[in-house]
């Protein structure tokens, strides 16, 4: 009932021309009302007769000045719109919000469901319309396809979102690691500079103590000389002021003493050439540090493999080896250099490890080629440590003699016309400004190089073997020689 009343009211406030709710309604003398825009357009289309026009519905003539706004209808239209836009106030589900009729038609052009009054309105005039039942299945299929497509796109979007989150997390980790590495490397640089500064200051303090000690001794000598002068002058003054007997008594000895007096000049060091401070080669230090940092990226986990238990002792963690003289054979003369190999074997790539040789008076380390782990544990003489024998090593002997072991040369290479083919061991002396407590070994298999670094001295290069011929698998090599102090493989964090 309420719906029917609402429809009747809508019919009363619907424009006969556009069939829509009245907009700015104008009323004629005949009582009919129209939208201001509709009646104005109608006036332009019709031919006026002596300034009069006719109503589009009843054709009753009226003067154009008699068009008057109908406020009452305008208010009704506003109230009606409020009711139509509020479903809880009376609008039925499935009914046109504008006309209150059932939504039974579908406008293909607008893609909306409409009622029969909407179909006849100017807004939908000429449009293709269908019963909703006729097009529902077609659009349901389309929407189902669209739904599947959107679900797939949603999955893709979620994956992209997850990828971005993962990349973001990865970047955060990388940046955090880079920050840590940068801080660590610059700390190492500062430590290097602090160490160099400390050494220079210590040298300066030693120089100061030495010079001041000598100057104090010189000052003491000058004080004794001055005191002896004072004693002699006092004796002369006493003789000159006393009697003749006092003047002449022992005068010859006094004169001889005066004649033998020689003024000793103090020992000074102004003209001595003292050590002039020179800033350390920071460029070289930084370059060495950069090279060391670069090769340390290839740090390998190396362990020791027992090869001759009678003369070498390996720790339980297989990272330390020391020499042990056989207790049951104390009189046996040791003719061999006993060593052990490291694991794993190397057949490609870049590998780096560090060895602590602190306080040892002798050691040999590097790499060697071998067909099996225990094939080359004994070397008869240090001269046999040669690349042609499969050894690329350096070592320390007699506490201070550092050497690299190169291939031997023949006497005939030095003596013209000599027929001798005897070999001269080529042991290359290595000069260390700072003795290494820790040695880094870097093997580049493809480049055929083996390099040794003095980690104790800021990573300066000790020696480098080039053009190495690796015909078999390569093993790290360690020989404690005959020194009972251990050689220890270092960890990256140590």
Curated annotation (Swiss-Prot):
<dbReference type="InterPro" id="IPR000315">
    <property type="entry name" value="Znf_B-box"/>
</dbReference>
<dbReference type="GO" id="GO:0043410">
    <property type="term" value="P:positive regulation of MAPK cascade"/>
</dbReference>
<dbReference type="InterPro" id="IPR013083">
    <property type="entry name" value="Znf_RING/FYVE/PHD"/>
</dbReference>
<feature type="binding site">
    <location>
        <position position="124"/>
    </location>
    <ligand>
        <name>Zn(2+)</name>
    </ligand>
</feature>
<dbReference type="InterPro" id="IPR027370">
    <property type="entry name" value="Znf-RING_euk"/>
</dbReference>
<keyword id="KW-0399">Innate immunity</keyword>
<keyword id="KW-0539">Nucleus</keyword>
<feature type="binding site">
    <location>
        <position position="96"/>
    </location>
    <ligand>
        <name>Zn(2+)</name>
    </ligand>
</feature>
<dbReference type="InterPro" id="IPR050143">
    <property type="entry name" value="TRIM/RBCC"/>
</dbReference>
<feature type="zinc finger region" description="B box-type">
    <location>
        <begin position="91"/>
        <end position="132"/>
    </location>
</feature>
<comment type="subunit">
    <text>Can form homodimers and homotrimers. In addition to lower-order dimerization, also exhibits a higher-order multimerization and both low- and high-order multimerizations are essential for its restriction activity. Interacts with BTBD1 and BTBD2. Interacts with PSMC4, PSMC5, PSMD7 and HSPA8/HSC70. Interacts (via B30.2/SPRY domain) with HSPA1A/B. Interacts with PSMC2, MAP3K7/TAK1, TAB2 and TAB3. Interacts with SQSTM1. Interacts with TRIM6 and TRIM34. Interacts with ULK1 (phosphorylated form), GABARAP, GABARAPL1, GABARAPL2, MAP1LC3A, MAP1LC3C and BECN1.</text>
</comment>
<dbReference type="GO" id="GO:0006914">
    <property type="term" value="P:autophagy"/>
</dbReference>
<comment type="pathway">
    <text>Protein modification; protein ubiquitination.</text>
</comment>
<feature type="modified residue" description="N-acetylalanine">
    <location>
        <position position="2"/>
    </location>
</feature>
<feature type="coiled-coil region">
    <location>
        <begin position="131"/>
        <end position="223"/>
    </location>
</feature>
<keyword id="KW-0051">Antiviral defense</keyword>
<keyword id="KW-0832">Ubl conjugation</keyword>
<dbReference type="InterPro" id="IPR001870">
    <property type="entry name" value="B30.2/SPRY"/>
</dbReference>
<dbReference type="InterPro" id="IPR001841">
    <property type="entry name" value="Znf_RING"/>
</dbReference>
<feature type="binding site">
    <location>
        <position position="118"/>
    </location>
    <ligand>
        <name>Zn(2+)</name>
    </ligand>
</feature>
<keyword id="KW-0833">Ubl conjugation pathway</keyword>
<dbReference type="GO" id="GO:0038187">
    <property type="term" value="F:pattern recognition receptor activity"/>
</dbReference>
<dbReference type="InterPro" id="IPR013320">
    <property type="entry name" value="ConA-like_dom_sf"/>
</dbReference>
<dbReference type="InterPro" id="IPR043136">
    <property type="entry name" value="B30.2/SPRY_sf"/>
</dbReference>
<keyword id="KW-0808">Transferase</keyword>
<dbReference type="GO" id="GO:0043123">
    <property type="term" value="P:positive regulation of canonical NF-kappaB signal transduction"/>
</dbReference>
<keyword id="KW-0072">Autophagy</keyword>
<keyword id="KW-0175">Coiled coil</keyword>
<dbReference type="Pfam" id="PF13445">
    <property type="entry name" value="zf-RING_UBOX"/>
</dbReference>
<protein>
    <recommendedName>
        <fullName>Tripartite motif-containing protein 5</fullName>
        <ecNumber>2.3.2.27</ecNumber>
    </recommendedName>
</protein>
<keyword id="KW-0391">Immunity</keyword>
<keyword id="KW-0479">Metal-binding</keyword>
<feature type="domain" description="B30.2/SPRY">
    <location>
        <begin position="280"/>
        <end position="494"/>
    </location>
</feature>
<dbReference type="GO" id="GO:0005634">
    <property type="term" value="C:nucleus"/>
</dbReference>
<dbReference type="InterPro" id="IPR003877">
    <property type="entry name" value="SPRY_dom"/>
</dbReference>
<feature type="zinc finger region" description="RING-type">
    <location>
        <begin position="15"/>
        <end position="59"/>
    </location>
</feature>
<dbReference type="GO" id="GO:0051092">
    <property type="term" value="P:positive regulation of NF-kappaB transcription factor activity"/>
</dbReference>
<dbReference type="GO" id="GO:0051607">
    <property type="term" value="P:defense response to virus"/>
</dbReference>
<dbReference type="GO" id="GO:0002218">
    <property type="term" value="P:activation of innate immune response"/>
</dbReference>
<keyword id="KW-0863">Zinc-finger</keyword>
<dbReference type="GO" id="GO:0000932">
    <property type="term" value="C:P-body"/>
</dbReference>
<dbReference type="GO" id="GO:0008270">
    <property type="term" value="F:zinc ion binding"/>
</dbReference>
